[in-house]
Amino acid sequence: MALMTWTAAEFGTNVGFADDQHKTIFDMVNKLHDTAATGNRSEIGKQLDALIDYVVMHFKSEETEMQKKGYADFAAHKAEHDKLVGVCADLQKKFHAGEAEVNQDTTRFVRDWLVNHIPKVDKLYGPCLSA
């Protein structure tokens, strides 16, 4: 069963590239959530790395568009991105050093961040970036 499901009503920003990337992130988190239940560290590590790489790329895409369009809340938005990237990088480093686990609690943390960030923060850039 999926940990999270993207719907336009709940998560749509009306910015095509962002919505498409959010859907991919949801799919990747769901896959990592299912794999985390198996305890297969090798596969978990591969999926964790792919997810973090994709999220970093996504954040850069959003930030580039925000700067191009002169989005007023760019600095605060980027600060939220930077904070999550820092948490993820620390987890990634510790996981690969054998000092941390990635389990379903981890994926629920990511879900909770996304289901708060997208509707409350990302949706605010919709009018600016889609103009």
Swiss-Prot record:
Q: Which NCBIfam families match?
A: bact_hemeryth, hemeryth_dom
Write out the similarity annotation. Belongs to the hemerythrin family.
Residues the entry annotates as binding Fe cation 2: 62, 77, 81, 117, 122
Q: What the protein does? A: Oxygen-binding protein. May be involved in a storage mechanism or for delivery to oxygen-requiring enzymes. The oxygen-binding site contains two iron atoms.
Q: Which SUPFAM superfamilies match?
A: Hemerythrin-like (SSF47188)
Q: Please name the InterPro entries in this protein's record.
A: Haemerythrin_Fe_BS (IPR016131), Hemerythrin (IPR050669), Hemerythrin-like (IPR012312), Hemerythrin-like_sf (IPR035938), Hemerythrin_metal-bd (IPR012827)
Q: How does it assemble?
A: Monomer.
Keyword Iron belongs to the record: yes
- Residues annotated as binding Fe cation 1 are 22, 58, 62, 122
- Please tell me whether the keyword Metal-binding is annotated for this protein: yes
Q: Which GO terms describe its molecular function?
A: metal ion binding; oxygen carrier activity
Source species taxonomy: Bacteria, Pseudomonadati, Pseudomonadota, Gammaproteobacteria, Methylococcales
Which UniProt keywords are present, listed alphabetically?
Answer: Iron, Metal-binding, Oxygen transport, Transport
**Name this polypeptide is given:** Bacteriohemerythrin
